UniProtKB/Swiss-Prot annotation:
Stretches assigned to coiled coil: none
Protein family: Belongs to the dGTPase family. Type 2 subfamily.
Domain HD: 72-220
InterPro entries, A to Z: dGTPase, dGTPase-like, dNTPase_2, HD/PDEase_dom, HD_domain, PHydrolase_assoc_dom
Disulfide bonds: none
Organism name: Mycolicibacterium paratuberculosis (strain ATCC BAA-968 / K-10)
Pfam short name (any one): HD
Basic and acidic residues bias locations: 1-20
One Gene Ontology term of the molecular function aspect: dGTPase activity
Protein name according to UniProt: Deoxyguanosinetriphosphate triphosphohydrolase-like protein
Xref: Gene3D superfamilies: Hypothetical protein af1432 (1.10.3210.10)
Length: 423
């Protein structure tokens, strides 16, 4: 395997499953763009329809709630940016880590995790549904870009290292240690075996670990920011012992690795930060808005820089890539991030109005799924109709239905339901 002395990645990392013909549309006398393989991969994800659809898919609150909502797309952009900054400090390829951030939620269905739950119910007898496995399926087959010699879709035909950087759960359903999450379906096991060739079993590459931590940081900090702006979260609860104890109790039930005492200590540390105190009772004034933005910026820096420093201390100097290091995050920092997640859970996701809305969303997905199946292939988009017609059994046909719904934006799903499948 060829490795440039200045490039810590080798030809094996840059290999694609399907060989691609040279481009032919360039003008005579011109040269193609001088881009790395990972820069090309990043561009493929950036220009994909699946990424654009995330603009109309829920992060925490719906994409049409409020004037400046966070969607799955804006969240993915934030994860990509945080990950890229961490890659600078660790010596990972910047395009590779940014790509992983952009693609980490590309398989999410309408209504985010709530939609995942509904589609998992729809496909329960046929392998279920998982957003992370759908990420892999989109990148390796569903998103049109490259065909193999038999005319089958190879998806975006990303390099091995790029695909591996998106895999947070490198196993199939039921194979993961202590988690129900999984990274690919049985249907995609050949592609997964190709990507994971030579990789340590059950272990994420460093670039995927960076993406995963960037996801945690973005989710915890920015979703709390949205909660503060919407007046659902008041950060002063962190300094109230009774409120903090209630959050710690909830957190202990949600995070098995973080105890109540750890949550209480995290609340004391965060509430003592000047940037937290400066937000106070948010009132949307200029001063309050600036204070909140400074808070989010400083917390992102706090959590990202802690991971960089701790990893460097353990792994030493030089480029840290692929399986040459493990991302190390201090336990106290993990507790702080977990506490912010609990704030969003307590004051946003546990709101009875939010839960009622979610119940209606799941019903809609079930309704549309059965309407699609009953009328298939007529009710499906052409690509999915062809897949339905050639499906070998009922399980494969239901997988097509799930793929179709997962591809919908929330607006399209709701229009279809109102027009065809509604009561």
């Amino acid at each position: 395997m060829t490795r440039n002395q200045h490039d810590p990645y080798d030809d094996f990392d840059r290999q694609r499953r399907v060989a691609e013909a040279p481009k032919t549309a360039g003008l005579p006398g011109t040269e193609g763009q001088h881009r790395t393989d990972f820069a090309r991969d990043r561009a493929r994800v950036l220009h994909s329809a699946a990424l654009r659809r995330l603009a109309d898919k829920t992060q925490v609150v719906g994409p049409r709630e409020g004037d400046t909502p966070r969607t799955r797309l804006t969240h993915s952009l934030e994860v990509a940016q945080i990950g890229r900054g961490m890659a600078v400090g660790l010596g990972c390829d910047l395009d590779l880590v940014e790509l992983a951030g952009l693609a980490h939620d590309i398989g999410h269905p309408p209504y985010g995790h709530n939609g995942e739950r509904a589609l998992d119910e729809v496909a329960a007898a046929y392998g279920g549904f998982e957003g992370n496995a759908q990420n892999f399926r989109i990148l390796t087959s569903l998103e049109p870009k490259v065909l193999d010699a038999q005319g089958n879709s190879a998806g975006l035909n990303l390099t091995r290292a790029s695909l591996d950087a998106v895999i947070k759960y490198p196993w199939r359903r039921g194979e993961g240690p202590g988690t129900s999450k999984f990274g690919f379906y049985d249907d995609d096991r050949e592609a997964a075996a190709w990507v994971r060739a030579g990789a340590p079993a059950g272990r994420m590459c460093l670039e995927a670990q960076v993406m995963d931590w960037a996801d945690d940081v973005a989710y915890s900090v920015h979703d709390v920011e949205d909660g503060v702006v919407s007046q659902r979260i008041d950060l002063r609860v962190l300094a109230d012992d009774d409120e903090a104890a209630a959050l710690a109790k909830l957190g202990e039930s949600e995070f098995s690795r973080v105890g109540a005492d750890d949550f209480m200590a995290a609340a004391r540390r965060l509430s003592a930060l000047p940037v937290v105190a400066a937000v106070g009772k948010y009132d949307a004034t200029l001063a309050s808005s600036v204070a909140l933005k400074r808070l989010t910026s400083e917390l992102v820096g706090r959590f990202a820089s802690a991971a960089i420093a701790t990893t460097r201390a353990a792994a030493g100097p030089g480029p840290l890539v692929r399986y040459r290091a493990e991302l190390a995050v201090p336990d106290l920092v993990r507790a702080e991030v977990a506490l912010l997640k609990i704030l969003a859970l307590q004051f946003i996701m546990s709101d009875p109005r939010h839960q009622q809305t979610q119940a209606g969303q799941r019903e809609r997905i079930h309704r549309v799924a059965h309407w699609l199946y009953a009328g298939a292939p007529r009710t499906l988009d052409p690509v999915f109709a062809a897949a339905f017609n050639t499906a070998a059994d009922d399980g494969a046909r239901w997988r097509v239905i799930v793929d179709q719904i997962a591809s919908y934006t929330e607006g399209r799903l709701e229009r279809i339901d109102a027009r065809q499948a509604g009561p």
